[in-house]
Amino acid sequence: MDDRITPRGYLIDVDGVLRNGSQVIPGAVEALSWLRSAGIPFRLLTNNTISSRASLAAKLSDAGFPVTASDIFTAAFATASHVAQRFPGVPCYLLSTGDSAMDFHAAGVSLVGPDGSPEAGVVVIGGAEHELTYARLNHAYRLLLGGAKLIAMHRNVAWRTDEGMTLDSGPFIEAIAKAAGVRILTIGKPSAPFFRQAVRAISLPASSLAMVGDDARNDIAPAQRLGMTGILVRSGKPVSATDEERARVTLDSIADLPAWIQAKTQE
């Protein structure tokens, strides 16, 4: 995107941008409310795999954010849609904490547990946290050896919670894929199809959009490759000088976004 152009719409990450753990980032509610009142379209694009779209929308709405489920694209929702379309009727072994299984059930995906019959032909791993026990990982490993496909909702290395930076599922997914000698299909960020899905939903060309995120690798870089403006915020994951150089714009937090937009429109 030409840096002189003001974006007409925004894709916005959730964790590290709107909230850290359960704590709402100061000014985030006001920023989204300002976008809504100004008639500027936005969608929330998140690798959250713990919540279904409906439950995440409810949590954010309870915190004061002016959002509904239709405003949100989660890695879990996108993965459920992909499995339903590409592997119709194939049993799926899902490793993911929370209620994201609701999106799989809604999409018509048949989920089986470690003692399920028939054996799963697809292994899906999300933000599994306490689900990532040795026994469950080993079961997934054996399924992969038997020919099951491996799908990652995302491959994030870490994320920020109320307790601080926390190890995510990415390293475990890499390990199990290496052990089984299989390839990983990643659905969520930074995969281009995930971004394109949100672009189609917002009904604007990618070149007229901006991505607001706290992760230079998973948020900013893929968005900029599609022609968007990358807006990196310092409110979540640690941001290096190199990260700031790669992003077209760097802000302290999303609270600064309305002022940045207003300044751009006056240029």
Question: Which residues make up each language-model segment?
Answer:
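Asp-based, Mg2+/Mn2+-dependent phosphohydrolase catalytic module
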Residues: 2-40, 49-73, 80-267
